[in-house]
Regions:
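Active-site neighborhoods and metal-handling regions in enzymes and metal-associated proteins
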Residues: 1-447
Length: 447
């Protein structure tokens, strides 16, 4: 697989019209519930750096990106009225300081009535005439950009749209497969760089080069962690210095295709040693969790299944002693594995709606003692979730068990052995099916 053929443009073009019809149906229902006639979706505006004269990297409104593969286009408006062709007000600023967006082109243009404007003031004449009949979706920090529409992000409509976004169309799934293939290229390059003894910073650069992204185009900041840095869940640095001894490498990094993300984690041992054996065993554990994914399964139950498997592995590895339920109840598994099993994935890496019980906004809380579980819903066909168990030496969490039965269950000598390796996390992106799942990540690595 090469970067120039990760995207199947023909498949995307074939699926896109049905995707737009699905979005129309969702927005028809949302407008009816909100008692409105038109929805206006703002792509977003750049945000200025405090006390400076330049902007932060632009991040688009995910509702806009769900309609259009335009992730770098501020000041655009999508206007949809049921029964009518969607209107795209396409902002093409006349500017010699920055390169304006290219004229609209691609497989998507035939689905829209495209109106190119060169000044923000020209947007208004392409919007519905009665703002009281409109709802506006977007991050509006300048009232002028609302063009008189007062109903901004109404909960009645937003809850319905957010709940529905968890289920992916064929077009969205194809984008995510391509994002997985792109991400796999980066992960292969990163492993090669690790084996060659490169620094975290150098590995990060090799990853970006392999996926064809600038740092700002990544779906999230790459986690590139050598040795003990792998114990920091969202390790945010890329050290220029090489460690005196290379032991382990944890990389959590994704890629984008037309706004849709992959979110992939792998862990590698430098030597063929006991840690390498533990990583292999953990890979088996992760795949056993993937095998439990299917429509109708409560994701919170999967999360607790993971804790039971982690408890067994802790005993097998000599890191703890005790019965499975006792290790969970005493907080031992949470000390080694403090995060959730996974989350919804899509345009947003932590896609919206993971704790929604229905399309009215009912919240499903995570199980007691597991506050960081981002997905608590019953799984449905064509959702895409991450399955990302972890095992880490996080001293502050182990220290919190001092004076409790859980502290005595831990073999602290064995923990000292594992500490220099940091931790293990393995993460796949998995599509939910009626009788099982499609593993987008493993398929991408096999391509």
């Amino acid at each position: 697989m090469r970067l120039d053929n990760v995207i199947d443009e023909a498949a995307l073009a074939a699926h896109y019209p049905d995707h737009i019809e699905s979005l129309k149906n969702r927005h028809d229902a949302a407008l009816e519930r909100a008692g409105a006639s038109h929805v206006v979706i703002f792509s977003g505006a750049p945000q200025r750096v405090f006390l400076d004269d330049y902007d932060y990297p632009f991040k688009p409104n995910p509702h806009f990106v769900s309609w259009l593969p335009l992730a770098a286009h501020p000041f655009c408006y999508l206007v949809y009225t049921p029964g009518h062709r969607p209107v795209l007000v396409y902002y093409q600023e006349q500017d010699y300081w920055h390169l304006p967006p290219a004229s609209p082109d691609g497989f998507w243009v035939s689905q829209f009535d495209i109106r190119v404007v060169h000044a923000i003031g020209d947007v208004a004449r392409h919007l519905p005439g009665d703002p009281d009949k409109c709802i506006l979706i977007g991050d509006i920090r300048d009232e002028a950009l609302a063009f008189g529409i007062e109903r901004v992000n109404p909960g009645t409509a937003m809850n319905m749209l957010h709940y529905a976004r968890s289920t992916k169309t064929a077009y969205e799934l194809e984008c995510m497969r391509a994002a997985s293939r792109r991400g796999a290229l980066g992960h292969r390059a990163a492993e090669k760089a690790f084996r060659a003894g490169r620094s975290e910073y150098q590995i990060h650069l090799d990853y970006c080069r392999a996926v064809g992204h600038t740092e700002n185009e990544l779906p999230y900041g790459n986690i590139v962690a050598l040795n003990e840095n792998g114990a920091v869940l969202h390790y945010q640095h890329q050290s220029r210095d090489k460690p005196a001894k290379f032991r382990s490498f944890l990389i959590d990094a994704g890629a984008r295709v037309y706004g849709y993300a992959s979110d992939i984690t792998r862990t590698y041992a430098k030597e063929d040693d006991e840690f390498a054996t533990l990583v292999e065993r953990f890979d088996e554990l992760q795949l056993s969790l993937v095998s439990e994914v299917r429509a109708g399964v409560n994701f919170a139950d999967l999360h607790m299944s993971c804790h039971r498997k982690i408890a067994v592995l802790l005993v097998e590895a000599g890191l703890a002693n005790g019965r499975t339920d006792a290790l969970i109840d005493a907080g031992v598994t949470s000390a080694f594995y403090p995060h959730g099993l996974g989350h919804l994935l899509g345009i947003q890496v932590h896609d919206i709606g993971g704790r929604m019980g229905d399309d009215t906004g009912t919240v499903i809380d995570p199980p007691s003692g597991h506050p960081y579980l981002r997905l608590t819903r019953v799984l449905e066909t064509d959702q895409v979730v991450t399955i990302e168990p972890g095992l880490y030496v996080i001293d502050m969490l182990i220290e919190e068990l001092e004076g409790t039965p859980g502290h005595a269950m831990i073999d602290h000598g064995r923990v000292s052995w594992l500490r220099p390796y940091g931790g293990i996390r393995i993460e796949d992106n998995v599509r939910v099916l009626v009788g099982g799942s499609e593993n987008l990540t493993r398929d991408a690595f096999a391509a």
